Amino acid sequence: MIQIVFDSKTGNVQRFVDKTPFRNKRKVSTEEYLDEPFVLITYTTGFGEVPKTTEMFLEKNAHLLLGVAASGNRVWGDNFAKSAEKISKQYQVPILGKFELSGTAKDVELFTQEVERVVTKSSAKMDPVKQ
């Protein structure tokens, strides 16, 4: 089962993660090296920036990153959930969702569908029999 790794400052991302059906969840650790693929959910800080803790985690683990989602607040306009865009561009992974604060039931549903899609696609790439 896919790992969901998350970074939460105010608890919004934690609440979003708690609403997902995924069981293998862990909070970002700047010291941790992972050994299996994961999906990242983070928040956006400042003026559309990626949190430092997320950056430090990705320095060690980005090679296993399958996709990213981010929270934000729509009052920030173009900077809404901008961290997802920055991580997607830097690490060439898909954006699996953007949600406001702790997200809605629809946000969770769409994120879950995107995770399942990216995991299926990733599994097919790793299994030459499926190609």
Curated annotation (Swiss-Prot):
GO terms for biological process: protein modification process. Coiled coil: none annotated. InterPro entries: Flavoprotein-like_sf, RNR_Ib_NrdI_bac, RNR_NrdI. Pfam families: Flavodoxin_NdrI. GO terms for molecular function: FMN binding. Probably involved in ribonucleotide reductase function. Belongs to the NrdI family. HAMAP family: NrdI. This is Protein NrdI. It comes from Bacillus licheniformis (strain ATCC 14580 / DSM 13 / JCM 2505 / CCUG 7422 / NBRC 12200 / NCIMB 9375 / NCTC 10341 / NRRL NRS-1264 / Gibson 46).
